[in-house]
């Protein structure tokens, strides 16, 4: 199937029975004048009637769970599961986006892309096959009115997308793929010559080039295939054709960064770790740690 056919087919996902009522709520949201602050909290403010404030809250509440954020929309504070500014602020000193074509693979509701607007990229394109996250993005962008393009596509579509990027962000995706080297090759195919990738993934401690292959779940996440040592990750990247591999940071996931709030449904990090030993998951594996790396395609 051609990429345009896939895009058309997936736009139909917005009519799924669990998504269509949310799209209807979104379609009833009026256009209003507002101010937008693209800081740690993406804040939308303005003088609106109380009835619209209530409509905003009810619409946002219906769109739970909110994984990335936070957002403040006319006083409705969307306290997302992740304090996404912690990761964004860690990466921001390392990138230059001005005048560049930028992609965010696995963009969720677009929090990082909204933040990136302050760097004046030429274009911003998000890839994520979730119609719920796309609807959350459309809700926020209804007020932000950005030119961000959001595609209901996955990383496997990047090579066929028809546009190449100067910078690609791929945060928290690699461990969900059963063939991580193939995924890294797809990302490389989406880069212009000299382009950069900012990648983060789970890792385990160790000097050997090996990877943990969890059973049914890792930290109660069902689709984690491989958790490599940093040396194994570097070898994967080399096998995918990346000669430049720079470690930017390593960091354990903390209760400050990821926690249960009323804006999500179900459990969060505190439920995923062994209560007797928070350095282990409930399955007995090493607790989640992330490594942040920069990859570069040769000119």
Swiss-Prot record:
Read off the Pfam families from this record: Methyltransf_9
Q: Name one GO molecular function term.
A: transferase activity, transferring alkyl or aryl (other than methyl) groups
GO BP field: tRNA wobble uridine modification
Q: Which residues hold carboxy-S-adenosyl-L-methionine?
A: 68, 82, 87, 106, 128-130, 155-156, 175, 290
Under catalytic activity, the entry for this protein gives: carboxy-S-adenosyl-L-methionine + 5-hydroxyuridine(34) in tRNA = 5-carboxymethoxyuridine(34) in tRNA + S-adenosyl-L-homocysteine + H(+)
Coiled-coil residues = none
Top EC group? transferase
**Which protein family is named in the record?**
Belongs to the class I-like SAM-binding methyltransferase superfamily. CmoB family.
Q: Which HAMAP family match?
A: tRNA_carboxymethyltr_CmoB
User: What role is this protein assigned?
Assistant: Catalyzes carboxymethyl transfer from carboxy-S-adenosyl-L-methionine (Cx-SAM) to 5-hydroxyuridine (ho5U) to form 5-carboxymethoxyuridine (cmo5U) at position 34 in tRNAs.
- Entry protein name: tRNA U34 carboxymethyltransferase
**What is the organism field in this record?**
Nitratiruptor sp. (strain SB155-2)
Write the gene name. cmoB
